[in-house]
From Swiss-Prot:
Keywords: Cytoplasm, Heme biosynthesis, Metal-binding, Oxidoreductase, Porphyrin biosynthesis. Its EC number is 1.3.3.3. Belongs to the aerobic coproporphyrinogen-III oxidase family. It comes from the Bacteria. The gene is hemF. Involved in the heme biosynthesis. Catalyzes the aerobic oxidative decarboxylation of propionate groups of rings A and B of coproporphyrinogen-III to yield the vinyl groups in protoporphyrinogen-IX. Its cofactor is a divalent metal cation. The active site is at 114 (proton donor). It comes from Legionella pneumophila (strain Lens). One of its GO terms (cellular component) is cytoplasm. This is Oxygen-dependent coproporphyrinogen-III oxidase.
Length: 309
């Protein structure tokens, strides 16, 4: 008997329950790592349908700014960013649920990170629903450490292995391609996992894969923070961190599909733009000093590679 891709009647409730639990688990872990500052929760409603819970930590001991956002929005018409490449979505009402987070640390030796898991369904009367999962996690170091990159990608591999040996290399390559700043001709970071439009085998299979990736995020990030958060740094390192944060802002405002979807669908601007760094510095035509640790980021870490060889 073939496995069905039919959407269970309670799919939204299942996913929402998991996402709220994931948001809480991640926030508890980050508060424990920081040891000083708690998240502030801001619940919000969207006039066109839905709402969410945005949790923000600011000026902590370890984290300069961290945002962990849950949203569940719905509407009668899809924004252009979602329907442009999928004609079958025209004329359907939609629901989109997700947890999205971005963490900007105080210490430049601790990488910035982003993670997202989401579900999307578009429905129309007398038609089968169109649904899929998406998400992933990626790492943006300022000063690279090989052992951190290997740990990050090993944890990403562990998240994917239960679903087949082809998943990690596919999602890893997708991440490298997606988080590439075309106008700079450089990667945003050292990658990780990225997937979208995932609707394979069955709803249960697809949901389990999304959960595995969501659950492995904190396992990937926490040990790296623990190793790097107490390394001494000075003005030079902080200035480089703020300069590189400019690349983060450029990517999010120019290319990121989640940002574009949120803004075009009338989402909550404060929650959508929580990903932006608290302090950013642009400097005209700046280049790192030859042989410096700053240059090594560009030469040894940002170019896409297989970290598990």
């Amino acid at each position: 008997m073939p496995i069905s891709k039919t959407l269970p009647y309670n799919a939204i409730e299942q996913i929402k329950s998991y996402l709220l639990q994931l948001q809480n688990t991640i926030c508890v872990s980050l508060e424990s790592i920081d040891g000083q500052t708690k998240f502030h929760e801001d619940s919000w409603q969207r006039a066109a349908g839905g709402g969410g819970k945005t949790r923000i930590m600011a000026n902590g001991n370890v984290f300069e700014k961290a945002g962990v956002n849950f949203s569940h929005v719905s509407g009668e018409q899809l924004p252009a960013s979602a329907s442009a490449h999928r004609e079958e979505l025209a004329g359907r009402h939609f629901s989109a649920l997700g947890v999205s987070l971005v963490i900007h640390p105080q210490n430049p030796y601790v990488p910035t990170t982003h993670a997202n898991v989401r579900f999307f369904v578009a429905e129309k009367e007398d038609s089968e629903p169109v649904w899929w999962f998406g998400g992933g996690f990626d790492l943006t170091p300022y000063y690279g450490f090989i052992e951190d990159c290997e740990h990050w990608h090993q944890t990403a591999l562990n998240a994917c292995l239960p679903f087949g040996e082809t998943i990690y290399p596919k999602f890893k390559r997708w991440c490298d391609d997606y988080f590439f700043i075309k106008h700079r001709n450089e990667a945003r970071g050292i990658g990780g996992l990225f997937f979208d439009d995932y609707n394979e085998i069955s709803f249960d299979h697809s949901f389990e894969l999304m959960r595995s990736i969501g659950d492995h995020f904190i396992l990937a990030y926490e040990p790296i923070v623990a190793r790097r958060k107490d390394i001494p740094f000075g003005n030079r390192e902080k200035a480089f961190q703020n300069y590189r944060r400019g690349r983060y802002a450029e990517f999010n405002l120019v290319y990121d599909r989640g940002t574009l979807f949120g803004l075009q669908s009338g989402g909550r601007t404060e929650s959508i733009l929580m990903s932006l760094p608290p302090i950013v510095h642009w400097e005209y035509n700046w280049h790192p000093e030859k042989g410096s640790n700053e240059e090594k980021l560009y030469t040894d870490f940002l170019p896409a590679k297989d970290w598990l060889k």
